[in-house]
Curated annotation (Swiss-Prot):
Record's GO cellular component terms: plasma membrane
Metabolic or biological pathway: Bacterial outer membrane biogenesis; lipopolysaccharide biosynthesis
Residues annotated as transmembrane: 37-57, 66-86, 89-109
Role summary: Translocates 4-amino-4-deoxy-L-arabinose-phosphoundecaprenol (alpha-L-Ara4N-phosphoundecaprenol) from the cytoplasmic to the periplasmic side of the inner membrane.
Annotated PANTHER family: 4-AMINO-4-DEOXY-L-ARABINOSE-PHOSPHOUNDECAPRENOL FLIPPASE SUBUNIT ARNE-RELATED (PTHR30561:SF23), SMR FAMILY PROTON-DEPENDENT DRUG EFFLUX TRANSPORTER SUGE (PTHR30561)
A Pfam family this chain is assigned to: EamA
Record-given protein name: Probable 4-amino-4-deoxy-L-arabinose-phosphoundecaprenol flippase subunit ArnE
Gene source species: Klebsiella pneumoniae subsp. pneumoniae (strain ATCC 700721 / MGH 78578)
Keywords annotated in UniProt: Cell inner membrane, Cell membrane, Lipid A biosynthesis, Lipid biosynthesis, Lipid metabolism, Lipopolysaccharide biosynthesis, Membrane, Transmembrane, Transmembrane helix, Transport
Bilayer topology term: Multi-pass membrane protein
Matches recorded under HAMAP family: Flippase_ArnE (MF_01869)
Family, similarity comment: Belongs to the ArnE family.
Length: 112
């Protein structure tokens, strides 16, 4: 698997873990709160663990000075997910920041 694909997958898994944690805090049906929390926190651990393993393989191939800034993709994924899944409001400034992050990632990625 390409190291760049691994990097994107590691980022997506990290974000999935964060989103599962958010979902664990959401209301659930009465009497099912403990099961709800345990399920989503378990999913978070699974996603974060798999993301970490992929991240380790990325670090074997790419200098950390290049790889780590690429994780700023997480801000993009989480913003899109919060807006799309939970309909969280996102201000124009926030969208501008997300756009600048994407531009920075493209510049960094093409400099390798």
């Amino acid at each position: 698997m390409s190291v760049w694909i691994c990097l994107v997958c590691a980022s997506l898994l990290s974000c999935a873990g964060q989103l599962c944690q958010k979902q664990a805090t959401r209301p659930s049906r009465r009497g099912r709160r403990s099961r709800h929390i345990l399920f989503w926190l378990g999913m978070a651990l699974l996603c974060l663990g798999c993301g970490m393993l992929l991240w380790l393989s990325v670090l074997q191939s790419i200098p950390v000075s290049i790889a780590y800034p690429m994780l700023s993709l997480n801000f993009v994924w989480v913003t899109l997910a919060g807006w799309g899944i939970w309909h969280e409001p996102v201000a124009r400034r926030h969208w501008l920041g997300v756009g600048l992050i994407v531009v920075g990632i493209v510049i960094l990625g093409t400099s390798v």
